[in-house]
Design a protein with these regions (language model features):
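Beta-sheet entry/capping signal
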Residues: 88-94, 172
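Long, well-ordered, tryptophan-enriched scaffold segments
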Residues: 2, 13-48
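Substrate-binding rim/cap in mid-to-C-terminal beta-strand-loop elements of soluble/periplasmic
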Residues: 3-7, 25, 50, 79, ...
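Long, internal low-complexity/basic segments
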Residues: 35-38, 48-56, 106, 196
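A long, amphipathic alpha-helix that forms part
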Residues: 5-22, 52-90, 101-103, 107-148
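Short glycine/proline-rich turn/loop motifs
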Residues: 42-59, 175-181
């Protein structure tokens, strides 16, 4: 967490703009893409009080630390596969998250997410007193919806609004050095989590069994992503 201290004091409006510019520079989105506006249901960062900004910044620091920790653990798997000389011939699919950014804690965020879901939103003064607990075993925190919206750039809305791409799009990284040669290449084809199992079966040359232990199997939704 400490590596991210002070990295988010600019707020979610500016973070979203900065992310949008980097996405264009990397070619992740078209050069002529336009950034969607913040919905009125999401507070502007400058409309928060100073204490609210302190708590919100810490929550994003902790979230970023969690992502770095996740990357490190995935990296350990990569290290082992490389040490065993198996990585180049391994189809490695890295998919973190099942929706867009989580906005369930509302504009205030929460250091007790389950309590907030029951309508027991803790006041900002109490959150401030719990600042050092966030990210530890005594906290079940969830950042304010503004951060979810910012990290969903360039799309509108958050996980709770599945009718918009900000609610459903997630990044996915696929590695298979013996078969995928354009390292860092981008793919624009539509894909869904339902496509993962058909892709793995296609990669190893296996068909889905019609019967398992005498039970006829339903066909899988989804299609192989190998052609992409």
């Amino acid at each position: 967490i400490s590596r991210y201290r002070g990295q988010f004091t600019q707020g979610w409006d500016r973070l979203r703009e900065e992310t949008f510019r980097r996405q264009k520079a990397l070619g992740v989105i078209p050069a002529d893409a336009r950034l969607t506006a913040r919905h009125e249901g999401i507070k502007a960062w400058d409309d928060l009080g100073s204490e609210e900004q302190i708590v919100a910044s810490r929550m994003m620091e902790v979230f970023s630390g969690f992502l770095s920790h996740t990357d490190t653990q995935v990296g350990r798997i990569v290290d082992v596969l490389q040490a065993l000389d198996l990585f180049d011939n391994t189809l490695f699919i890295y998919l973190v998250g099942d929706n867009g950014g989580e906005g369930a804690a509302g504009n205030e965020g929460s250091t007790n997410y389950l309590g907030a879901l029951q309508g027991m939103q803790e006041p900002i003064g109490r959150q401030l007193k719990q600042l050092d607990d966030i990210g530890g075993p005594n906290s079940f925190a969830l950042y304010p919806a503004g951060w979810a919206w910012a990290t969903n750039a360039p799309f509108p809305w958050v996980k709770q609004v599945a009718s918009h791409l900000g609610g459903t799009r997630t990044p996915m990284v696929v590695s298979w050095p013996q078969r995928i040669h354009d390292q860092g290449g981008l793919r624009s084809q539509f894909s869904h989590v339902n496509d993962i199992t058909p892709t793995i079966l296609d990669a190893v040359g296996l068909a889905l069994p019609e019967m398992v232990n005498g039970v006829r199997q339903l066909p899988l939704d989804g299609a192989s992503l190998l052609p992409s």
